[in-house]
Amino acid sequence: MKAWSALGRLARVSPWLAPAIALAGFVLAFPIAKVVQYSFTDRTTFLDGQFVGLQNYGELLGDELFWRSLRNNLILMLSVPLSILLALVVTGVLYRGIRGSRIYELLIFVPFLPAVASIAVIFLYVLGNDGPLNELLRGAGADSLARGWLTESSTAIWAVLGVVLWKRIGFTVLLFSARMASIDRSLFDAAAVDGASWARTYWQVAVPQMRSIIGFAAVLGFIEAFSWTFAYVVILTRGGPDRSTFTLEYMLYRLQFDDQLVGLASAVAVFMLLAALAVAAYRVRLARREAFA
């Protein structure tokens, strides 16, 4: 009976949903389907190409640059747990009741406002050989620590990670602050009456109630670190030195526009799409489990 009732409701709303579904299908489904199709061909920019089956995927799996790019994406994903942990600490300090907390919150959020390209250009100067960071180290007598942060293979990807992390923290603090504002203050008052410290109250009372927003921040961060890092890499390092900062997104760009290998670039795009969908699906599964817990 419930099934028939659900079908009846679906039949009533279908005419209203149809235009939106059709638009989404045209804007999203059709391009995705074409990319998947191209990934099974040896298509180039100027030639339609022939069906080659899984050859492109096999070539990727055997390419050392693909694995290096994937490793770099995983390194950039460290920005997710780090930004969440730092944002939790900052949010706890701000809501401790320090004077001027709103001003500090605004200042922390400011790095998120400029475009990624603007942030990357700023750090291109800050992390340069003669930039403020190295000058500060030299002025402090730590000349041995001064280096080309973006021009040495051993430090370049970690420097990019630092820039990504610096930009993400402000947004994450904003999310957590909004959730904190909706938590019943009587819970904190009751804990204070029981003699609990603010730190203990925050981590044992507030943080558990922020699980949903933490999960949202994690999913968004993972997808960003996996698929939205192109601007950081292309401005800060252009994939160098010696391709040490290639990411999957930058590899896709080079395959598509420099090498004209549309089929191989499409295979990279499909891999990235599947990875993003897997993360999102895992989060949805956790959310459902929490809802029925």
Regions found by a protein language model. Name each.
Residues 1-9:
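Short, Lys/Arg-rich, polar N-terminal cytosolic tail immediately upstream
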Residues 9-293:
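A structural signal for multi-pass alpha-helical bundles of membrane permease subunits
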